[in-house]
């Protein structure tokens, strides 16, 4: 039980109450009345025999007259509004304790274990080691002989790395360098110091090059460095066009090669690169690798391989000929190609158009094929272009941006020859076409074409009618320019551009005037969606059949829309955003041509009038626009499976009324400089600290 002692001093008594424990050393403050605000002395006293405290120390003005204790009851406390308990936390306490432990280790005080490593002794405190390392905890707590030994020998472990790790345990700091990272990963793995293993992987991830990529793969497998393997695969995928040609590439394991070839972001020039890589890898050691050929062949996305290559290279290859399963895969693909189906290709952006057919030399694999092999490679999936439009300053743009799906970023490409807002943009015959619009002074009939292979725009024949708010689409390398408006008229006229002849002609007018109309192609039909007739925004739609040169009404949308974005994905037509008669819209709809029916989709995160829309990679992208207050540079993409919009990489310019279209181009064609292998090397002697 606690005892409270009274200390009475000299002729000037000062009573101090001190809580002590029986037989426990304590401190009593001796203070005289005259100097109680100036001086204080602390003298050790001991409770003796349970009833008397004594000391021989002098205090202040005289000797201690007497010291006695009087046990008494503890005073009563009553709970108040602040509660009956106060929790106190000192967040600095643990760090102060570790600082003291570090000092104790430096001075070799209270050290109770010696680690003998390669003839060197490292002194430490076993409780600290056990708390930091599961390896040491097991050694010191599981009845092992080391529990009672002062000196413990660690065999076959580098002394330097053990010393670095023990220092880290006491200091929370470690310097990882090119010279010690291999030993640190090994030692940290033995000592089960996962945090150091992860840090070493992070350091090595910054050192990956096309030259050490394969050896790091092997190293990562040995130590099960899953984080590093992921970083290596990302690097190898982005640099695949380079590393597949290196002599070291053939050393890659089957498991890693298969994982790499399955990636949609694999950077290839053509899908043929994948087949050639498979053959190269198997042929480097056919006796041990030929049995892997079928599994690797299944990573090949046959719908991306040209017919000529399929027949001449793939079908004639000895590994393919000797595999019944490979032959069956090819036969199924050919049979599927001969059985047209409107919605076989979940990734199609321009189904059944000449541009799409040109980009997809083979139709898709059968529905029974794995999803990963029935999709595009991002590097050969084409690009979305965003051209012209206008921003806050009011003047139209001539600038053009292209979306790199693999890198999830927009890049600048050469400007158009003219500034154009509310311009029509479409891809056809390997080129990108910009048609009509307004240049800030006048409505335009002019048109121009961009050739990705030489990164240049050129003039083409002008339309018969100058107009903005025009929509364009292509069928069989023929471009149709639909509707639009000028300062006095909303048009229902439609012009047809013959790419071969570089000549415009007129076709049948639409039933309704449509300025700010959206158009898209499904099969052999051209669809005109919404727009404005000069009086109000429209919900009506119609379909054009070039074979008979006639328009036909189809089901109306659920919302009036002008300046909306329209595209096709998986055989469905999407109408996104736009303006009604009052404000920009965030609503979206999808049209099923088989059922002649519109359904409502998930709303975008923001209203977007004058939005540009295109499909890529199985998703619909809504680009820029105006939300009623501001011009936007934000981009959203719609996942039809999840019925959900998600943000995507932003365009560089805030713009509305831009022309947006998907085109079958390779991103490396659009770069100002040729794509090079990325060495990723860090400076010599580089280090990584945690």
From Swiss-Prot:
Pfam families: BACK, BTB, Kelch_1. Kelch repeats lie at residues 383-430, 431-477, 478-524, 525-571, 572-618, 620-665. It is found in: Synapse. Component of the BCR(kel-8) E3 ubiquitin ligase complex, at least composed of cul-3, kel-8 and rbx-1. Interacts with rpy-1. Residues 213-314 form the BACK domain. This is Kelch-like protein 8. It comes from Caenorhabditis elegans. InterPro entries: BACK (IPR011705), BTB-kelch_protein (IPR017096), BTB/POZ_dom (IPR000210), Kelch-typ_b-propeller (IPR015915), Kelch_1 (IPR006652), SKP1/BTB/POZ_sf (IPR011333). Residues 111-178 form the BTB domain. The gene is kel-8. Signal peptide: none annotated. SMART domains: BACK, BTB, Kelch. GO terms for cellular component: Cul3-RING ubiquitin ligase complex; cytoplasm; neuron projection; neuronal cell body; postsynaptic density.
